[in-house]
């Protein structure tokens, strides 16, 4: 029986759908929560894909209804990784409750947040 690597095993249980495009990666959160249980997987995705050459991420949070400090931390990790590579992270589809948490945390000045996917995609080019 073949052994699966840790990352491959985690892929089986991810709360995210990943789309590889020619000049960017779209990460769609399929969970309604971006919390301490889900955030490590998002961090792993940022690290894995950036280590494999990706320098532009589009994060779809349309399904996310709840985000805690772990979720915000995961997004900050992705943002930091991409800034170090002179890349870009854009986020779209944030619901009002999550937007409020981001604003209270004063991260609305840190993240590149857009209303919809098309506007987000236009801003990574």
Residue map of PLM features:
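A short acidic, often aromatic-flanked loop/helix-cap motif at beta-alpha or helix-coil junctions
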Residues: 25, 119-122
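Amphipathic alpha-helical interaction surfaces in cytosolic regulatory modules
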Residues: 33-111
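Short beta-strand/loop segment at the start of cytosolic alpha/beta domains
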Residues: 2-27
């Amino acid at each position: 029986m073949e052994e699966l690597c840790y990352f491959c095993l985690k892929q089986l249980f991810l709360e995210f759908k990943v789309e590889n495009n020619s000049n960017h990666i779209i990460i769609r959160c399929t969970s309604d929560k971006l919390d301490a249980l889900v955030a490590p997987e998002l961090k792993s995705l940022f690290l894995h894909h950036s280590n494999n050459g990706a320098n532009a991420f589009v994060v779809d949070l349309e399904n996310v209804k709840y985000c805690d400090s772990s979720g915000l931390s995961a997004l900050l990790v992705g943002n930091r990784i991409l800034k170090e590579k002179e890349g870009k992270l854009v986020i779209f589809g944030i619901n009002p409750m999550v937007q409020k948490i981001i604003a209270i945390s004063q991260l609305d000045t840190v993240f590149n947040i857009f209303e919809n996917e098309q506007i987000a995609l236009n801003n990574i080019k």
